[in-house]
Amino acid sequence: MQHYGTRGVHGQTVEVLAQRILTGQFAEGATLDITALQSELDVSLTALREAMRVLAAKGLVDARPKRGTFVRPRDDWSLLDPDVLRWQFSRATRPGLFSDLHELRSIVEPGAAGLAAERATGSDVEALDVALAAMASAGDDIGAAVDADLAFHRALLAATHNELLQRMEVLIETGLAERDRMVHGAGPGDPVPSHRAVVDAIRRHDSADAARAMGRLLEQAVEDVARLADENR
């Protein structure tokens, strides 16, 4: 998915305003001075209004007669929107966000791995093997390592042949990408063995072992984040 920041002046305006809202620079309930923002950001009124429409669609702002455009409460935000998720994770705007991600993954992915072991076709296993090979060859290339990890988890969800589980990739991948960039940049251990254990269990159609292997993989992910947090203290 193309980020708004790569979509020209309109997209860059969306990014700037979203980050100010998510970081609290524009507080909940605050009325936005459109004229001042147009001057500060040096954009056309049309581009600014288009950006506001995007943010309104994502629940971040609203416009009312006599009140103007204002920041909506966090409870109104479309927190599962891919862009809103990315903005949150990229700026770590809320403590505990990665913990929430781990809890979600712990609920979804072991079950998904078990289901994949029951339903995976030969092409599903091949896609997992391709992701493993990419992971093994990524080396110190953080971008390649992140892409390979995302491809693995995407292939895992696809192997469940459950459309609703497959849609979870938007939620899981957005946070996983940011976590991977943070952890891989700090030089973690080899991720291939833990991922291969999941694939091998799926290849054997061993549902229980696949779920256990995914659980162990997630435990290692938590340990990696905790280790990095300790190192940065």
Where are these regions (language model features)?
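Amphipathic alpha-helical protein-protein interaction surfaces
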Residues: T121-D124, H161-L165
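Conserved donor sugar-nucleotide recognition element shared by glycan-biosynthetic enzymes
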Residues: T6-H10, D149, P191
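C-terminal all-alpha effector/ligand-binding and dimerization domain
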Residues: L132, A136, R167-R233
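Short loop-to-helix capping motifs
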Residues: I34, T160-E163, H205-D206
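All-alpha effector-binding/dimerization core of bacterial HTH-type transcriptional repressors
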Residues: D75-A155, P193-A213
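Short linear motifs at protein or domain termini
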Residues: M1-I107, G114, E231-R233
